[in-house]
A protein has these predicted regions:
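Structural recognition of the conserved hydrophobic beta-strand(s) that form the central parallel beta-sheet
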Residues: 96-102
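Acidic, glycine-rich active-site loops and adjacent beta-strand->loop/helix elements
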Residues: 75, 103-105
Length: 208
């Protein structure tokens, strides 16, 4: 089993220690690239590396500096042992998490619905891009809650003029999410009203 997991670069004698790098700080950046070809085979290794880093960040007695975790395609790392504690309790210890997910069902499938809900609810700020599945849209809508809306429209009956109707609705509706253009997101910061934000296309700096 071990021979099947430790393939490629993971067969070599390593010089990198996740625990030491987190403990010693120094502004180091660690890239762990997921190999789509053999990623499923290497998942235990990826999971171990990330779990070790999270555990080390949580083992500090106080905030000894920030440790940032940027994880894209979070569903590819199922069953991280310390992720729930990291997201929900690591903030006071300087552990910061930024996750990219395609939809909420993927996280529920990887971690179970209850644990997935606990993980997602632990994030302070959400950037909601356009999603097509109903479950993810429902999550975004429920996250921002409801309000009272005043709708104004012309009456279908002649001579009645303008009609006003008060109804309860979501702060962000399905149409708000599905009509988002590429690169635009609805930002949901804690304690503030949501707003739209257009990201600019990244351009490499021009060397002088």
């Amino acid at each position: 089993m071990i021979r099947e997991i430790f393939v490629g670069n993971f067969r070599k004698n390593g010089t990198l220690s996740m625990r030491q790098l987190v403990r010693n700080k120094g502004g180091r950046v660690i890239f762990v690239e997921y190999d789509l070809g053999i990623g499923a085979m290497l998942t235990p290794v990826y999971r171990l590396l990330i779990d070790l880093a999270i555990k080390e960040a949580l083992c500090r007695t106080s905030n000894e500096g920030n440790v940032y975790f940027f994880i894209d395609e979070f569903r590819l790392l199922p069953h991280l042992e310390h992720i729930d504690d990291g997201v929900n309790f690591g903030r006071s210890l300087g552990a910061k998490f930024v996750f990219g997910i395609q939809n909420t069902d993927q996280i529920a499938a990887a971690y179970g619905r209850d644990l997935a809900h606990s993980i997602l609810s632990g994030f302070g700020t959400t950037f909601a891009f356009r999603v097509n599945d109903a479950e993810s849209r429902e999550y975004i809508k429920e996250l921002l809650g409801k309000n009272i809306k005043l709708q104004t429209f012309m009456s279908a009956v002649q001579n009645r003029g303008v009609t006003e109707q008060i109804r309860e609705g979501y702060v962000v509706e399905d149409s708000d999410i599905t009509n988002l253009p590429v690169g635009q997101a609805i930002v949901c910061p804690p304690g503030c009203l949501p707003f739209r934000f257009q990201f600019r296309l990244y351009e490499s700096p021009v060397s002088s």
